[in-house]
Amino acid sequence: MGFLIGGSCFVPSVPLHSRFLSSPSSSSSSSPSSSQFGLLCSSNVAKFKRRRPTLASLNQEDGYEYDVASAKRRAFLLVGISVLPFLQLRSPALADERGNEIKTSKVDLETEVAVVSEGTSPNPFLALLNGLGIFSAGVLGALYALARQDTKAAEETIESLKNQLKDRERALVLKEKDFEAKLQHEQEERKKEVEKAKEEQLSLINQLNSAKDLVTELGRELSSEKKLCEKLKDQIESLENSLSKAGEDKEALETKLREKLDLVEGLQDRINLLSLELKDSEEKAQRFNASLAKKEAELKELNSIYTQTSRDLAEAKLEIKQQKEELIRTQSELDSKNSAIEELNTRITTLVAEKESYIQKLDSISKDYSALKLTSETQAAADAELISRKEQEIQQLNENLDRALDDVNKSKDKVADLTEKYEDSKRMLDIELTTVKNLRHELEGTKKTLQASRDRVSDLETMLDESRALCSKLESELAIVHEEWKEAKERYERNLDAEKQKNEISASELALEKDLRRRVKDELEGVTHELKESSVKNQSLQKELVEIYKKVETSNKELEEEKKTVLSLNKEVKGMEKQILMEREARKSLETDLEEAVKSLDEMNKNTSILSRELEKVNTHASNLEDEKEVLQRSLGEAKNASKEAKENVEDAHILVMSLGKEREVLEKKVKKLEEDLGSAKGEILRMRSQPDSVKAVNSTDNKEKSDNTVTVKKVVRRRKSSTSS
């Protein structure tokens, strides 16, 4: 053995392959129970403890080799110790000590081989039990390891999913914090921009004050600048028109933004509805999985019921075969009985012929009456014995027929039970088919809902694309408006610079126009009011633009969130599609199983139809047997009647023989009388001869007596003919 390499271990008496291949008959024996296996192992261990002689094990060679092969030796030792309880130990040797010489180990091995050769032959049944135990232990270990691996894999997947969920939650928290920080940063930047705008407004106010001072100083130059003021008025009117257009554009943009916001809200509602529908579909899928598990359990139960019914059918077939054999036997017995009855009939016919011959030969039988009487008595006794035997055989046949009928009734009961079981299984299969149809309808409904959800998702994607396009258009329009506002601002600053230059140029000319200063002041005050109003309008426009930017950013964020939700929905839809594919595959397997079950049911139907046909044949055969029984009974009755008639005929013949005997005695008496008369007649003739005179008288008397004798003989012959005719 391989585990003799390292350390002290047990040396088995017979190799393991010889134990498993010792007897072919042991392989065909049935597997024992686990308790018997444990008892046998314990008995083998006890025998091993009784018989073990000590042997020296193989010597440890070198320290280096031991260090190299230590792991292998430990493994072999563990394998040997685990296999020892399952081995048959008739004459084992225990190596307890480690020698220092290789020669002693070789000698011990040779002695062990000799002991093994002298030992008793192993029990093949126990060897087979050991092999089966080892095989079952290996199979159970492998199955347990596979189950543990599956459970570990499932637990690892669950833990990985939990870790992924935790990582996603952390990422979401970090994104929220980053988003809040970005919002705060943007708010601070907007505050800074507002402060800058306020500073610019203050600078503009200071510039306007300086311009007022310059106007007060340059009142003379207003006359020349009227034209310029008119031009400025025209420009202001154009700016106001542009501002009014910008306001109208702003209102249109606000209406568009409101419409987009309404669309976004509708999309959010649709997304919520889709999420609810997806949750419902997930719940339905879970329900489908649960129902599928139930159906699988029910299919297993049906398979077990089907196996039981197949076993019952096989037993019923065996019983039917036995009943057929018994019926064949009964048929053979009935054929033998029929042949015996035919022989009896032939004998009866022969007896009738003999009777007729006896009746025809009554004249000859009258001479051999004593011999005929003896033969008739012996034949009557033999006929009585034959009739009694035949009656006993008929009673046995009746008993066999009753037993066969009882067996047929039992088989009918069994077939009725089998038909009931078959109907129950058929009902269960009908119920399962209805459930499968319902599941198919539910699957079609889920498919329709999934298609509707896909259509809605596609519609949402189109709406999102449209909203994205509109947002891009709005951003472009806002950029255009912002650029126009910048251009208007630059034009306004340019005009202010030009006015400053013109005011400096016209400072020399304002001295002449001081008279018109007040009018110009009034006009300038109106212009300043208009400028203030325009600045206020510009500030309001800036605020509105800031709000528009905020709304655009919020809409962008909402669009990003919608994109994420759409991606998650797409992922969920893909997962649902995968689940549906898995469910379709499971459904296909279930449909195949159902088709197999239907095929098995069809086979069962065929078998039941065959059994019913066989039962009908058995019933017809039983009815035929009953008819034959009735025919036999009738034939037996007829035979009995014929035997009775034969007995009566024999009795009549006996009576006739007795009457003939009596008539014979009478005739003998008459003959004696006639002989006496003849003697007397002879004496008288002699006397008459002596007396010749009286001859005539004697002759006349003789003639009279002869006539009388002839008359009596004719009467006797007539009586015999009448008796024979009767």
From Swiss-Prot:
Highest taxon in the source lineage: Eukaryota
GO-annotated biological processes: regulation of starch biosynthetic process; starch biosynthetic process
Placement of sequence motif Nuclear localization signal: 715-722
Complex formation: Interacts with PTST2; the interaction is essential for the initiation of starch granules biosynthesis in leaf chloroplasts, for the correct location of the process in the stromal spaces between the thylakoid membranes, and for the association of PTST2 with the thylakoid membranes.
Transit peptide: 1-41, 42-95
Coiled-coil ranges per UniProt: 144-691
Post-translational modification: Predicted to be translocated into the thylakoid by the Tat system. The position of the transit peptide cleavages have not been experimentally proven.
Main location: plastid
Domain notes: The C-terminal part is necessary for DNA-binding.
Membrane-spanning parts: 125-145
Keywords (A to Z) from UniProt: Chloroplast, Coiled coil, DNA-binding, Membrane, Nucleus, Plastid, Starch biosynthesis, Thylakoid, Transit peptide, Transmembrane, Transmembrane helix
Keyword Disulfide bond: no
GO molecular function: DNA binding
Biased composition (Polar residues): 691-701
Region (Disordered): 678-726
Stromal side: 146-726
Name of the gene: MFP1
Function: DNA-binding protein required for the initiation of starch granules biosynthesis in leaf chloroplasts. Anchored to the thylakoid membranes with its C-terminus facing into the stroma where it is essential for localizing PTST2 and SS4 to the stromal spaces between the thylakoid membranes in order to begin starch granule formation. Associated with leaf chloroplastic nucleoids in vivo. Binds to various chloroplastic double-stranded DNA fragments without particular sequence specificity in vitro.
UniProt-annotated location(s): Plastid, Chloroplast; Plastid, Chloroplast thylakoid membrane; Plastid, Chloroplast stroma, Chloroplast nucleoid; Nucleus
Nucleus recorded as keyword: yes
The species this protein was found in: Arabidopsis thaliana (Mouse-ear cress)
Description of the deletion phenotype: Larger chloroplast starch granules than wild-type. However, in most chloroplasts only one large starch granule is present, in contrast to many in wild-type. No accumulation of ADP-glucose, the substrate for starch synthesis. No effect in amylopectin and amylose biosynthesis. Mislocalized PTST2 within chloroplasts. Loss of DNA-binding activity in leaf chloroplasts. Loss of both chloroplastic and nuclear localization in leaves.
Lumenal, thylakoid compartment residues: 96-124
Name of the protein described by the UniProt record: MAR-binding filament-like protein 1
Biased composition (Basic residues): 715-726
Annotated Gene Ontology cellular component terms: chloroplast; chloroplast nucleoid; chloroplast thylakoid; chloroplast thylakoid membrane; cytosol; nuclear matrix; plastid nucleoid
Membrane topology note: Single-pass membrane protein
